[in-house]
């Protein structure tokens, strides 16, 4: 999709969001976990189940981190599956860096707790639970790759968009665990 966007919008900055390392995890360890449990590794079910459009049947194909631990999957295996998912994305980004003109920046929308204890005397945290602020969640990489070519950007006046009801925005933020 990134290359298609570059073709369609050659004079625009592109923001390309990879779903990994969000679930489903990809890579050999994730495949072995799926063989062992019948499900892939996933995120935190309680936050997601608050969404109005939550699809329990679809979500049941994924283990929450807690489910994976209870099924005998070690913290280290979960961390390995997570790292392999990131490695798979990095492979894809390497070719994009070469193919897309101009500077490329790699960053993340958030970090992930992988069974660590960010709060003294607290329990282990998994995923990105709502209401938790920690370095593991908030400190993300920012890596810049310069290019010999500079992308020529074209500014255009903003297009009129229909306004969104503030209550709809608030509801969506609550559904995503931000409120």
What name fits each language-model region?
Residues 1-179:
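Catalytic domains that recognize anionic headgroups
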């Amino acid at each position: 999709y990134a290359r298609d966007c570059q073709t369609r919008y050659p004079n625009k900055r592109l923001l390309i969001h990879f779903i990994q390392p969000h679930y489903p995890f990809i890579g050999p360890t994730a495949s072995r976990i799926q063989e062992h449990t019948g499900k892939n590794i996933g995120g935190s079910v309680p936050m997601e189940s608050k969404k109005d459009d939550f699809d329990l049947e679809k979500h049941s194909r994924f283990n929450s981190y807690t489910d994976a631990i209870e099924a005998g999957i070690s913290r280290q295996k979960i961390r390995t599956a997570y790292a392999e998912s990131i490695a798979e994305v990095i492979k894809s980004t390497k070719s994009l860096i070469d193919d897309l003109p101009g500077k490329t920046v790699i960053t993340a929308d958030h970090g992930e707790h992988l069974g660590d204890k960010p709060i003294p005397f607290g329990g282990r945290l998994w995923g990105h639970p709502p209401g938790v602020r920690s370095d593991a969640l908030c400190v993300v990489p920012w890596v810049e790759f310069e290019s010999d070519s500079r992308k020529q950007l074209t500014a255009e006046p903003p297009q009129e968009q229909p306004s969104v009801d503030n209550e709809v925005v608030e509801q969506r933020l609550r559904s995503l665990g931000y409120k």
